[in-house]
């Protein structure tokens, strides 16, 4: 049976639990989760853990503050390919062309909603206000159907960029989430622009160290 997709917050907590187990050898407590995510109370962490358990991603073990067991690691490990990491994109070629793939990460794309098709490494801090930081891996769902306000992966004159989309009249504005930067303004009648997909999640750069 296919697992339900996670919300962005559930995905963040799930990744933190996995990373904590990998780095310390034990699951985090509810207090540690609340501190990491920014909850005021461990009860909020408990509710999100229950949601993860209902969706089949973890098992909650009674009688211990660290009673969390990951249920989907084997599923990810059995995925020989995982999600491809896209590197430098050559002019005039599809973003997912085989020559652009640097490596694969053992990440199950179905853990994101909508499902991720590939990863992009973030360069720079243009989206730092919403937690997309330099060096992070951005999970991307491939689609041409986008709405104003979504964070998109766009190709502008063969340069790939991650920005928040706004269509206004004949122009397309690609807004950064950094007060020190100006938006990119594109007139499709004069410049080439193609929307490659939408951002559906972020994997911190230290998650694979």
Swiss-Prot record:
Q: Which residue ranges hold the DNA-binding region?
A: 30-50
Q: Identify which residues the record assigns to the active site.
A: 126 (for autocatalytic cleavage activity), 163 (for autocatalytic cleavage activity)
Which keywords does this Swiss-Prot/TrEMBL entry list?
Answer: Autocatalytic cleavage, DNA damage, DNA repair, DNA replication, DNA-binding, Hydrolase, Repressor, SOS response, Transcription, Transcription regulation
Key word DNA-binding present in the record? yes
| Gene Ontology biological process terms in this record | DNA repair; DNA replication; negative regulation of DNA-templated transcription; proteolysis; SOS response
Q: Which InterPro entries match?
A: LexA, LexA-like, LexA/Signal_pep-like_sf, LexA_DNA-bd_dom, LexA_repressor, Peptidase_S24_LexA, Peptidase_S24_S26A/B/C, WH-like_DNA-bd_sf
* Domain of life per record: Bacteria
Gene3D superfamilies in UniProt: Umud Fragment, subunit A (2.10.109.10), Winged helix-like DNA-binding domain superfamily/Winged helix DNA-binding domain (1.10.10.10)
Reaction catalysed by this chain?
Hydrolysis of Ala-|-Gly bond in repressor LexA
MF-aspect GO terms: DNA binding; serine-type endopeptidase activity
* The protein's enzyme class: hydrolase
According to its UniProt record, the EC number is 3.4.21.88
List site positions: Cleavage: 91-92
Q: Name one Pfam family in it.
A: Peptidase_S24
Q: Does the keyword Cell wall biogenesis/degradation apply?
A: no
Relate the assembly described in the record.
Answer: Homodimer.
Record-stated family: Belongs to the peptidase S24 family.
What is the documented function of this protein? Answer: Represses a number of genes involved in the response to DNA damage (SOS response), including recA and lexA. In the presence of single-stranded DNA, RecA interacts with LexA causing an autocatalytic cleavage which disrupts the DNA-binding part of LexA, leading to derepression of the SOS regulon and eventually DNA repair.
The molecule here is called LexA repressor
Q: Encoded by which gene?
A: lexA
